[in-house]
Amino acid sequence: TLIDILQCLGTNLTEFFAEESDEQIVFRKDDFFVKKDTELHNTIEWIIPNAQKNMMEPILLTLESGGSTYLDVPHEGEEFGYVLQGSIQIHVGKKVYTAKKGESFYFTPHSEHYITANKTSGAKIIWVTTPPSF
């Protein structure tokens, strides 16, 4: 049968009949979507377009001095970040953690959480969530 032949070839019906599409691997600045929040003093750059349809969603977050992200409610998943510039405070539930340039953070978002920059300098971080939540 066709299924037996496809198994011998190391594929299946879905893969065999799927239309091939060119998957974009490299994304340039022109591909990014940028949103500036003047109230919270932050800028979010979605560095992978349409990442909401993927398993994880990376962003480049720039916080002005004293800037913050919005308060996020508890949800399933994982969150990871790497501080490129400055120093941040990660607020998870009632605890506050500090990370500075060259340091990273990771947590499961089972509590309300948000990030702030210190009042004297801003910060820039790569922040990745799974599943997508930005």
Residue ranges and their predicted role:
Residues 42, 100-101, 109-134:
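Ligand-binding loop in jelly-roll beta-barrel domains
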Residues 11, 21-45:
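Charged, helix-prone or intrinsically disordered regulatory segments positioned adjacent to compact structured domains
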Residues 47, 93-109:
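Short acidic-glycine-tyrosine-enriched beta hairpin
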Residues 1-9, 13-17:
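Hydrophobic micro-packing sites on short alpha-helices
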Residues 69-75, 116-118:
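Short histidine-centered beta-strand/loop micro-motifs
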Residues 34-71, 128-133:
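A short glycine-rich, His/Asp/Glu-containing loop-to-beta-strand
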Residues 62-63, 73-90:
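Short, conserved beta-strand element in jelly-roll/cupin
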